[in-house]
Amino acid sequence: MAGLLALLGPAGRVGARVRPRATWLLGATAPCAPPPLALALLPPRLDARLLRTARGDCRGHQDPSQATGTTGSSVSCTEEKKQSKSQQLKKIFQEYGTVGVSLHIGISLISLGIFYMVVSSGVDMPAILLKLGFKESLVQSKMAAGTSTFVVAYAIHKLFAPVRISITLVSVPLIVRYFRKVGFFKPPAAKP
């Protein structure tokens, strides 16, 4: 019910426009720093990140007229969120092309083969997955009673997708850099 109410919004209809009260929280259309009145209303123990953001722009750079002796680490606004794994994978595929795609497919096939071999050998995979920290509801939904060995292996293979994607994201640039250094690949073309 709460999900339906969130979809409908406060006006009770889908797509109702709501004017936000704190436009400075949106980031893209408003400055990153909250207005001075909002800073005065915050509790006395202010977060250092909030103070750095209020003193400078949203990337941690300060106005030279307001510079202090301390240097803060780079702070980003909420508008600059980290990309998801799938977005990072698409970027790798666009940048490295067939090398990225073929390496990811190779890693996926090896992973599926290993999980098929483990499941067909009779290892109790649900117990291992629970020890690794997967939720019991997730494990039970992926492993219904009476499913074939391949289906169970494929379900476990899908559970480990973030690991495979991370391996691809780390290894593709390293492999391409090595092959370019050896001379197997041409250096990248200069962008106009």
UniProtKB/Swiss-Prot annotation:
Tissues expressing this chain: Expressed in late erythroblast differentiation stages. Underexpressed in ovarian cancer epithelia cells compared with normal human ovarian surface epithelia.
Keyword Repeat: no
Disordered as annotated region, ranges: 57-80
Transit peptide feature, positions: 1-58
Keyword Mitochondrion: yes
Domain (DUF1279) ranges: 80-191
Subcellular location: Mitochondrion; Mitochondrion outer membrane
Composition skew (Polar residues), residue ranges: 63-77
Sequence similarity: Belongs to the FAM210 family.
Role this protein plays: Plays a role in erythroid differentiation. Involved in cell proliferation and tumor cell growth suppression. Involved in the metabolic reprogramming of cancer cells in a PDK4-dependent manner.
Name assigned to this protein: Protein FAM210B, mitochondrial
